[in-house]
Amino acid sequence: MKIGLVKANFPGERRVPLLPKDIKDFKNEILVEEGFGKFLDIDDQEYSDKGCHILSRAEVFAESEAIFSLKLIQPTDYYHLREGQMIIGWTHPFGSGQSFMKEQALPKKLIVVDLDSNSPCIYYENEIFESGIPKGLLYKNSFYAGYAGVLDALLQYGLIPTEETKIAILGSGNVAQGAFSSISKYSSNIRMYYRKTMSIFKENYTKYDIIINGIEIGKDDDPILSFSEQKSLKKGTLIIDVAADAGNTIEGSHFTSIDAPIYENAGKYYYVVPNTPSLIYRNVSQELSKILSENIFRKDCSRFIEKVKPLNK
């Protein structure tokens, strides 16, 4: 199968998900956009030496049966997408990718292979199929999201925590673990809350100086911090949403970017950057390339089409 890799044009994105050193025994033909590895100083020739075809962005879209885009494909590229094409990457169908699914995936009958760490699935014509991709495959990327996001938020806010700084972390998954690993180097005054202990957090949330969210709630779930609860927070409270569940877990919050990571509202400060692993792209690219090579690129990606064949007749 012909798989095209395009440079992510998502704001601030620098990760390179496939490195030449990991290209070996691929069952797919790889088409790479010119300058794909520039953030890691990788020349096009290094990809060409591994058997990849180097093309312009438009040519990659036109000639590929599947497009791999690490982050959500942006509206500027919508016109490139053609009916029945496969899209592989983090598409967040129920989150930031809802408009993409509605405006592109459904009308163009795209086969969307979403690489969600907890539940990688295939989305096609309003149906969801098992992808066969192992769950938790990209857990290190989630860990780095929490780790790097917390560091960046603290520096952008202008504060290194001390033992006097009261810190709450919501969640127990990979993102929350990364957040704890990062912030615990500066303070031990940290309380972690899980879904089962959220009632205790609700009793104490106004005491905290920093609240770090590592939970992504369901589309029909109530927010963990409602509008009214946010009003009760101390002036200057920093809310770091490293799960980047904008508008959901923290009601009314909105995405920020690496270039403008924090906004203030009613004396509270919000950090909701959706691609924090890109802050440490040199580390993350190494991890991603190895895992994606073994589990996505090396195996014939036409296997994903087989999964949706009952509807694709």
Curated annotation (Swiss-Prot):
Gene3D superfamilies: NAD(P)-binding Rossmann-like Domain (3.40.50.720). GO terms for cellular component: plasma membrane. Its EC number is 1.5.1.24. Transmembrane segments: none annotated. Stable to heating at 50 degrees Celsius for 10 minutes. Rapidly inactivated by heating at 60 degrees Celsius. It is an enzyme of class 1 (oxidoreductase). Keywords: NADP, Oxidoreductase. Is potently inhibited by the reaction product N(5)-(L-1-carboxyethyl)-L-ornithine. SUPFAM superfamilies: Formate/glycerate dehydrogenase catalytic domain-like (SSF52283), NAD(P)-binding Rossmann-fold domains (SSF51735). It catalyses: N(5)-[1(S)-1-carboxyethyl]-L-ornithine + NADP(+) + H2O = L-ornithine + pyruvate + NADPH + H(+). CDD domains: ceo_syn (cd12181). Optimum pH is 8.0. Active over a broad pH range of 6.5-9.0. One of its GO terms (biological process) is ornithine metabolic process. PANTHER family: ALANINE DEHYDROGENASE. Catalyzes the NADPH-dependent reductive condensation between pyruvic acid and the side chain amino group of L-ornithine to form N(5)-(L-1-carboxyethyl)-L-ornithine. To a lesser extent, can also use L-lysine as substrate (yielding N(6)-(L-1-carboxyethyl)-L-lysine). NADH cannot replace NADPH in the condensation reaction. Belongs to the AlaDH/PNT family. CEOS subfamily. This is N(5)-(carboxyethyl)ornithine synthase. It comes from Lactococcus lactis subsp. lactis. The gene is ceo.
